[in-house]
Amino acid sequence: MPRVSILLTCYNHIKYLPIAFQSILDQTFQDYEIIALDDGSTDGTRQWLESQNHPRLKLIFNESNLGTYGTLNVGLQAAQGEYIAVFNDDDVWLPTKLEQQIALLDSNPQIGLVHTDGYFIDGEGQERHDSPLGFDFPRTETGDILLALIYANSIIASAVLARRECFDQLGGFNPGYFGSGDWEMWYRIAEHWQVGYLAEPLTLYRVHGANASHKLDRIWRDDLKLRTWISPRIDSYKNRFPESELTRARAHNLACLGTVQALTGDPQSARSSYRESLRFDPTRWKSRARILATYLPQKLFRKLL
């Protein structure tokens, strides 16, 4: 039985798939299985995968296009490893990624997942020195990072190695999400386990024109669902974090909820969320300004953000 199951999600990235696959083969830690999950690609991905002669490669082809998280759940059902790695077919791992993550997990049973530092690359594999998705490569400390995950998704999916036990206890990914299901999954894990972080850049996230992260309308719908789901959970953390930290986190989550409500065409609910955010933190001047902005046409509100 392999120690690591690598869930290699594939969808119409044949240009990048061989590079991603080779970065798996180049890992210094070799006790793994590769479960290649093709979600209905039409660009030759299936044929390329079928041509690979690797004894630890399992192929699962889905013709109905389940989406990222439904596809990952199929992979979880097939996985036999003690640890689960998620790897997108357009990203790249550096050779010691799995080795270092295994060492951290083996020595810290309280850690449920460990992620690494990294950087963004372009379609040609060159490092990006800007913030192409509007944020820096996500980083955390090792420890209890649950509140940090309220502020933003601080974990890149391809940077993660998680215990299979986490998925066995909490269930798999929520297939109702388009692009934020990994954020929701890491959040659920962080509610019950600590999160480990390796400060070495071992994961390269490729940014190109076909990234799902560019489909903003669907991402905003995801954020609306996620922020609504998080709000009632915060009260249950009262014995875990200082009240001042919880108050700021509540205010932030409500302000973010207000913004995605406005972005998705519900300005009345947005104003209510912004006002509730200000009740917890009256110093949030952006929330005051955005209450006024919700009275503007939706297209203008989007431009003002």
Predicted regions and their residues:
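Glycine-rich, basic loop-to-helix element that forms the pyrophosphate-binding segment
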Residues: N62-A79, D89, Q100, D144-L146
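N-proximal low-complexity "stem/linker" segments adjacent to membrane-targeting elements
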Residues: M1-L25
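Conserved donor NDP-sugar-binding/catalytic core segment of glycosyltransferases
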Residues: T96-H129
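Acidic helix N-cap motif at the loop->helix transition within catalytic regions
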Residues: K15-P18, S41-S51, V92, T96
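A conserved acidic beta->alpha catalytic loop
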Residues: S23, Q30, D38-Q47, S64, ...
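Short aromatic/hydrophobic "clamp" motif used to bind/position activated sugar donors
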Residues: I84
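Conserved nucleotide-sugar donor-binding catalytic segment
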Residues: Q77, F135-L226, G265
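C-terminal subregions of glycosyltransferases and related glycan-biosynthesis enzymes
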Residues: V207-L305
